[in-house]
Amino acid sequence: MNGIQVDINRLKKGEVSLGTSIMAVTFKDGVILGADSRTTTGAYIANRVTDKLTRVHDKIWCCRSGSAADTQAIADIVQYHLELYTSQYGTPSTETAASVFKELCYENKDNLTAGIIVAGYDDKNKGEVYTIPLGGSVHKLPYAIAGSGSTFIYGYCDKNFRENMSKEETVDFIKHSLSQAIKWDGSSGGVIRMVVLTAAGVERLIFYPDEYEQL
């Protein structure tokens, strides 16, 4: 056949990506996770209202960045392992969940595009945050940020984060941080979703663009 010949294997795959802004922050009563909601395929916005905050156990949640398919699959596998762990040993700790994430990400690091933040609450350790970047290492931190939009807010977060903030202060901190990430990062946008984990249980919050764009 005459005409232009194209090597399909050399074309970039149109993988759906959570090019994103995610974070989790400990505060005096627990921990709060936050994320934007834009999903992209290259320069195309595939979904404006994606939920990047995923439950893996009652009070253990994760923020997902990287390949949407990879991170959804990992979260599903971790949820299965934690349910199995619960039936044998009782309620898992946040550290246990982070270890399962780390094992999966490290063992498959050459095949996955996944950056995960794991956060949870239990009566013994209270609120905890673990970040698992590309490659599968794990780091416990008082707060963590990740995704393409995080590049723009490292300075802001470092200056404004304080330990033992109140719930209201922490929600405000996350809202301000993610609003700046969304402002400067083309792969971040949509609504800001949050999950609050405390002794009282799980609370979900959502903030629309008209509530944060003027910050």
Curated annotation (Swiss-Prot):
One of its GO terms (cellular component) is nucleus. It catalyses: Cleavage of peptide bonds with very broad specificity. The keyword Phosphoprotein does not apply. Its main location: cytoplasm. Keywords: Acetylation, Cytoplasm, Hydrolase, Nucleus, Protease, Proteasome, Threonine protease, Zymogen. InterPro entries: Ntn_hydrolases_N, Pept_T1A_subB, Proteasome_bsu_CS, Proteasome_sua/b, Proteasome_suB-type. The modification N-acetylmethionine is found at M1. GO terms for biological process: proteasomal ubiquitin-independent protein catabolic process; proteasome-mediated ubiquitin-dependent protein catabolic process. The active site is at T20 (nucleophile). Residues 1-19 form a propeptide. It is found in: Cytoplasm; Nucleus. GO terms for molecular function: endopeptidase activity; threonine-type endopeptidase activity. It comes from the Eukaryota. PROSITE patterns: PROTEASOME_BETA_1, PROTEASOME_BETA_2. Gene3D superfamilies: Glutamine Phosphoribosylpyrophosphate, subunit 1, domain 1. The keyword Plastid does not apply. Belongs to the peptidase T1B family. The 26S proteasome consists of a 20S proteasome core and two 19S regulatory subunits. The 20S proteasome core is composed of 28 subunits that are arranged in four stacked rings, resulting in a barrel-shaped structure. The two end rings are each formed by seven alpha subunits, and the two central rings are each formed by seven beta subunits. The catalytic chamber with the active sites is on the inside of the barrel. The proteasome degrades poly-ubiquitinated proteins in the cytoplasm and in the nucleus. It is essential for the regulated turnover of proteins and for the removal of misfolded proteins. The proteasome is a multicatalytic proteinase complex that is characterized by its ability to cleave peptides with Arg, Phe, Tyr, Leu, and Glu adjacent to the leaving group at neutral or slightly basic pH. It has an ATP-dependent proteolytic activity. PRE3 and PRE4 are necessary for the peptidyl-glutamyl-peptide-hydrolyzing activity. This subunit is necessary for the peptidylglutamyl-peptide hydrolyzing activity. The side chain of Thr-20 acts as a nucleophile, and the N-terminal amino group acts as a proton acceptor. Present with 7250 molecules/cell in log phase SD medium. This is Proteasome subunit beta type-1. It comes from Saccharomyces cerevisiae (strain ATCC 204508 / S288c).
